């Protein structure tokens, strides 16, 4: 959520910056709500002051032996008026808060202009896409014949966009998770956390999925729970309604969870294979840092996600998303896109974002500034390190041979019991 003071003091400038991402801020509605709030707040304060003055007068009149009943009746009437004003103020503040909850984050000045992915800017590349001297198979063709990837049974068990993995494919999937967790905890300084896969609405409001994106979520309405769309939600909310001490920040968390998304609006997209599933898994990186550290933290976090791809010998590129292509809560996002030979293109495998204090303000996540001793809002960041299913796809397609065998990257072999080749003929 944006700082209300920013909107009060810099309304037109903020509206112009939000327009970069294609969002039209309703300045008239905000100005009206804010004016009404201020008017009622002033009226409420005046009533409180007047009631306090009259209450004090009762004591003075009583000490003089005067009749205090008229004063008591007046104080009672003022109390009723004050209660009514406080109710109106509370309702108006709730309306204003709901309005603020629907406003996305302001893009950082370094974010490229543009309204869609065509305006994203390539920052760097790593690795060269492999040149094959045989017809390239995509991951479906590599995984189906042996039954490693069983889309038919997944559809029978649940429906479209679900998959069963068997044998060495399930083992490889598990190996990727363990490899990522070990890398981030041992080399990058993250604390591993295990979190609930079901969360309440407050958690989703804190990170920005609610109220605007409820259609993308799986909702267990009778219990008030939602299946998590990403570990970002429960992990970032570890700091909700909390004041961390200076020694606890910066904090780095890593968590492996399943993720559940309805894929509303994705009908007809990536219907083949593992690229877009209702249920998939990610290893998520979250950082909670003081404001002055967040931009360095974004570069570091992005590098941590990149390191996974480098160790798996997978070519990729890093893209700075333009203002119109960023997520609702983000101030700046880098997408890491891995090369997929089966599609002959780069596909997103991680989004690394700095939210500044946007999420922290929504969830009241703070730390105590050691210099002032006062609580200040944290800056929050997150990124996939990595999406496990898409990493699996990339390993299959980039490390295949002419016989349809998969050569296991050296970094994964200890997690595969020393296995060097997955051979569908064996």
UniProtKB/Swiss-Prot annotation:
GO annotation, biological process: selenocysteine biosynthetic process; seryl-tRNA aminoacylation
InterPro entries, per database record = aa-tRNA-synt_IIb (IPR002314), aa-tRNA-synth_II (IPR006195), aa-tRNA-synth_II/BPL/LPL (IPR045864), Ser-tRNA-ligase_type_1 (IPR002317), Ser-tRNA-synth_1_N (IPR015866), SerRS_1_N_sf (IPR042103), SerRS_core (IPR033729), tRNA-bd_arm (IPR010978)
- Name of the top EC class for this enzyme: ligase
Q: What does this protein do?
A: Catalyzes the attachment of serine to tRNA(Ser). Is also able to aminoacylate tRNA(Sec) with serine, to form the misacylated tRNA L-seryl-tRNA(Sec), which will be further converted into selenocysteinyl-tRNA(Sec).
Q: Look up the EC number in the record and give it.
A: 6.1.1.11
What is known about its subunit structure?
Homodimer. The tRNA molecule binds across the dimer.
Show the catalytic activity. tRNA(Ser) + L-serine + ATP = L-seryl-tRNA(Ser) + AMP + diphosphate + H(+); tRNA(Sec) + L-serine + ATP = L-seryl-tRNA(Sec) + AMP + diphosphate + H(+)
Print the domain comment field. Consists of two distinct domains, a catalytic core and a N-terminal extension that is involved in tRNA binding.
Q: Under which pathway is this protein filed?
A: Aminoacyl-tRNA biosynthesis; selenocysteinyl-tRNA(Sec) biosynthesis; L-seryl-tRNA(Sec) from L-serine and tRNA(Sec): step 1/1
Put simply, this protein is called Serine--tRNA ligase
Compartment annotation: Cytoplasm
Q: Does the keyword DNA-binding apply?
A: no
Tell me if Calcium is a UniProt keyword of this record: no
């Amino acid at each position: 959520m944006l700082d209300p003071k920013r909107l009060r003091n810099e309304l037109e400038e903020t509206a112009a910056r939000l327009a970069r991402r294609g969002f039209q801020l309703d300045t008239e509605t905000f100005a009206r709500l804010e004016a009404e709030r201020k008017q009622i707040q002033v009226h409420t304060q005046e009533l409180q002051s007047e009631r306090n003055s009259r209450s004090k007068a009762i004591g003075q009149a009583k000490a003089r032996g005067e009749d205090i009943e008229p004063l008591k009746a007046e104080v009672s009437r003022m109390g009723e008026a004050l209660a009514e004003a406080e109710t109106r103020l509370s309702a108006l503040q709730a309306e204003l808060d709901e309005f603020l909850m629907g406003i996305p984050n302001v893009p950082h000045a370094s974010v490229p202009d543009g309204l869609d992915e065509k305006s994203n800017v390539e920052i760097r590349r790593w690795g060269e896409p492999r040149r094959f001297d045989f017809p390239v198979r995509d991951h479906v063709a590599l995984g189906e014949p042996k039954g490693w990837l069983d889309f038919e049974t997944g559809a029978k068990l649940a429906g479209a966009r679900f998959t069963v993995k068997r044998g060495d494919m399930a083992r490889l999937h598990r190996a990727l998770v363990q490899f990522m967790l070990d890398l981030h905890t041992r080399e990058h300084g993250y604390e591993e956390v295990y979190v609930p896969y079901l969360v309440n609405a407050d958690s989703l409001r804190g990170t920005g999925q609610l109220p605007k994106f409820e259609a993308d979520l799986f909702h267990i309405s009778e219990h008030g729970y939602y299946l998590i769309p990403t570990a970002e939600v429960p992990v970032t909310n570890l700091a909700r309604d909390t004041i961390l001490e200076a020694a606890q920040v910066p904090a780095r968390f890593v968590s492996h969870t399943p993720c559940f998304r309805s894929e509303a609006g994705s009908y007809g997209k990536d219907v083949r294979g593992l690229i877009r599933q209702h249920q998939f898994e990610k290893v998520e990186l979250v950082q909670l840092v003081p404001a002055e550290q967040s931009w360095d933290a974004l570069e570091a976090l992005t590098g941590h996600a990149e390191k996974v791809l480098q160790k798996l010998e997978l070519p990729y590129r890093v893209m700075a998303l333009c203002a119109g292509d960023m997520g609702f809560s983000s101030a700046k996002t880098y997408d890491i896109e891995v090369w997929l030979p089966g599609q002959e293109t780069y596909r997103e495998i991680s989004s690394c974002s700095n939210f500044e204090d946007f999420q922290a303000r929504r969830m009241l996540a703070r730390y105590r500034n050691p210099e002032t001793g006062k609580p200040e809002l944290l800056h929050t960041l997150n990124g996939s390190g990595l999406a496990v299913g898409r990493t699996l796809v990339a390993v299959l397609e980039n490390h295949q041979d002419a016989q349809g065998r998969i050569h296991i990257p050296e970094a994964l072999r200890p997690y595969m019991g020393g296995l060097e080749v997955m051979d569908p003929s064996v």
